């Protein structure tokens, strides 16, 4: 999960992160958990997101399910013929989230993950 609306010490909903100027992203989110560790995205990492409501199959995206207050980071797989969307973690300890038919209305893609920044020192 990603804490989408975490407030900083001033009570603001935004903060600043030092990042490479070559990263073309609209916002970043801090990762909480290990569901994407197979993609080397670890707890505490910053994920840079480019806003877009659709992403290519196999892309990693930040997704909100059921208007939750947190976003989840998953690999997106969509079968347009069957109208099935699979949100796939990169950790076998977690299950796929599968949506079809009217359930697809529960999904809001915030954007595509375009870069990751680890806090490993």
What are these regions (language model features)?
Residues 61-62, 97:
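Short, charged beta-strand/loop "edge" motif centered at a coil->beta-strand transition
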Residues 64-66, 88:
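A generic structural motif
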Residues 51-52, 90:
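Fold-independent oxyanion-binding glycine-rich loops
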Residues 46, 73-75, 98:
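Well-ordered beta-strand positions in beta-sheet-rich domains
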Residues 47-49, 62:
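Hydrophobic beta-strand signal
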Residues 89-98:
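Flexible, small-/acidic-enriched active-site or ligand-binding loops
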Residues 1-42, 54-57, 67-71, 75-84, ...:
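Short, positionally conserved secondary-structure boundary motifs
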């Amino acid at each position: 999960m990603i804490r989408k609306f975490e407030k900083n010490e001033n009570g603001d909903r935004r903060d600043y992160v030092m990042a490479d100027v070559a990263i073309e992203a609209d916002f970043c989110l801090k990762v909480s958990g290990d569901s994407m560790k197979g993609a080397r995205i670890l707890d505490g990492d910053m994920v840079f997101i480019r806003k877009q409501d659709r992403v290519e199959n196999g892309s990693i995206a930040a997704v909100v399910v059921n208007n939750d207050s947190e976003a989840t980071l998953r690999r997106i797989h969509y079968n347009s013929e069957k109208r099935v969307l699979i949100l796939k973690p990169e950790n076998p300890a977690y299950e796929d989230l599968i949506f079809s038919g009217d359930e697809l209305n529960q999904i809001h893609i915030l954007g595509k993950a375009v870069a990751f920044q680890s806090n490993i020192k």
